[in-house]
A protein has these predicted regions:
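Conserved ABC transporter NBD signature motif
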Residues: 58-66, 73-74
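ABC transporter nucleotide-binding domain
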Residues: 176-269
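Catalytic Walker B motif of ABC-type/P-loop ATPase nucleotide-binding domains
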Residues: 156-159
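Conserved ABC ATPase signature
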Residues: 131-135
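Helix-to-loop junction immediately C-terminal to a conserved catalytic motif
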Residues: 50
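Conserved ABC ATPase "signature" region
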Residues: 98, 102, 109-127
Length: 316
C-alpha cells in the first residue's frame, strides 16, 4: 500500500490548470520531496492531500483513504505545516501548541512535557513569553513546524518548512524531520531549495507546470545526467596526449580535455565507478596520478536537465 497515491489528478483555478493529470505515489515510511519552482503545483498538491482544497478531477488517497469522500479520516491521520505560519495573534507559543495538541487528541498528561521538549528542540523556549504577533519570521515558522513535531502524525506535510529560517535553524528542523521519519511517519516536503531537498529526501519528485517530470533518489537523478560528473586530474607521465586518448575510451567517459601538460578535465558518468578504472589505466601507462578532484551535478543541474530551465530562474 502506498502512503499517498494520486491518479489523473487535476486542479483548475479559472483558466489556470495548476495540476495536469498528476500520477504520483509516496511509499510508506519515506521522506518524499517535491522540488519545483513557484507555480509548479507543489502547494496545490499539498493542499489537496491536506483536504483544504478539492481536486477538479482525478483521485487522491492518503493511507488508502480518499481525500474527498473520507476527508475527516484523512485529517485524523495526517498533519500539515503550512507555508505561511498560522497562529492566534495574541496568544503565546505554548498556548498555540497546547491548543493544537488538544484538537489532535494528545492526552492531557503528556501535553506539557511534549510541548516543552519540542520548543527546546527548535530553540523556541526563550520565546515562550512572546505573543505570536511579536515573533520574528523565523520564530513563527519554527512554531508552525513545531505543531507537527508535537502531533507526530502518520502522514506529515511540510510546505517549505525552513523559509525565513537561518542556516542553524534549518539544520535543526531537518534533523527533527529525519527523526520523525525514523519513528515511522511518512513525510512529504515541498521546497524550491536544492540544499534542503538533497539533505532531506529519500526520493525526489521534480514538478514543473503541474506535472511530475521525474522521480528517483538523489544519487540516481544525478547519475542520469550523462557526463554530469567532472573529474579534474593532475598527472605526471611521458605522453599526456596519449593518456587523453586512452581515457577517452574508458566506459563512462563523455569527453576528456587537456587543460595543460599535466592537468586534465574529464566529463564522465558515475565518477565513483570511473575513477578506479582511470587510476588503473594510468598505472598501466606509467603515468602517476598526483591529484583527483570530483565535482558532481547539483539538483539545479538535474532540474535543468529534465525541464530545460534552471530552478533558480524558474523560481523568480
Amino acid at each position: 500500500m502506498f502512503a499517498v497515491e494520486t491518479k489523473s489528478l487535476t486542479k483548475q483555478y479559472g483558466k489556470t490548470q495548476a495540476l495536469k493529470g498528476l500520477d504520483f505515489t509516496v511509499n510508506e515510511g519515506e521522506i518524499m520531496v517535491l522540488l519545483g519552482p513557484n507555480g509548479s503545483g507543489k502547494t496545490t498538491l499539498l493542499l489537496i492531500l491536506a483536504t483544504v482544497l478539492k481536486p477538479t478531477s482525478g483521485t487522491a488517497k492518503v493511507m488508502n483513504v480518499d481525500v474527498v469522500t473520507q476527508s475527516t479520516r484523512v485529517r485524523q491521520i495526517s498533519g500539515t505545516a503550512f507555508q505561511e505560519a498560522r497562529g492566534f495573534w495574541r496568544h503565546k507559543p505554548m498556548e498555540i501548541l497546547r491548543f493544537h495538541a488538544t484538537i489532535c487528541g494528545i492526552p492531557k498528561g503528556k501535553r506539557e512535557a511534549l510541548i516543552e521538549q519540542v520548543m527546546k528542540d527548535l530553540e523556541l523556549w526563550d520565546a515562550r513569553g512572546k505573543l505570536f504577533m511579536h515573533l520574528s519570521g523565523g520564530q513563527a515558522k519554527r512554531l508552525e513546524v513545531a505543531k507537527l513535531f508535537v502531533q507526530r502524525p502518520r502522514f506529515a506535510i511540510f510546505d517549505e518548512p525552513t523559509s525565513q529560517v537561518d542556516l542553524r535553524g534549518k539544520r535543526i528542523i531537518w534533523e527533527q524531520i529525519h527523526k520523525l521519519r525514523d519513528e515511522g511517519s511518512t513525510i512529504l516536503v515541498a521546497t524550491n531549495e536544492v540544499r534542503e531537498a538533497e539533505y532531506l529526501a529519500d526520493r525526489i519528485t521534480v514538478l514543473d507546470q503541474g506535472l511530475s517530470v521525474v522521480c528517483d533518489t538523489v544519487r540516481r537523478l544525478k547519475d542520469s545526467i550523462s557526463g554530469g560528473d567532472i573529474v579534474e586530474l593532475e598527472v605526471d607521465g611521458p605522453d599526456s596526449k596519449k593518456i587523453v586518448e586512452e581515457l577517452s575510451k574508458l566506459e563512462g567517459t563523455v569527453r576528456v580535455t587537456a587543460m595543460n601538460e599535466n592537468q586534465l578535465r574529464a566529463y564522465v558518468s558515475m565518477a565513483e565507478a570511473w575513477v578506479p578504472k582511470m587510476t588503473n589505466l594510468c598505472y598501466q601507462k606509467n603515468t602517476r596520478v598526483l591529484s583527483v578532484r570530483v565535482t558532481e551535478p547539483s539538483l539545479d543541474d538535474v532540474f535543468l536537465h529534465f525541464t530545460g530551465k534552471s530552478l533558480g530562474v524558474a523560481t523568480t
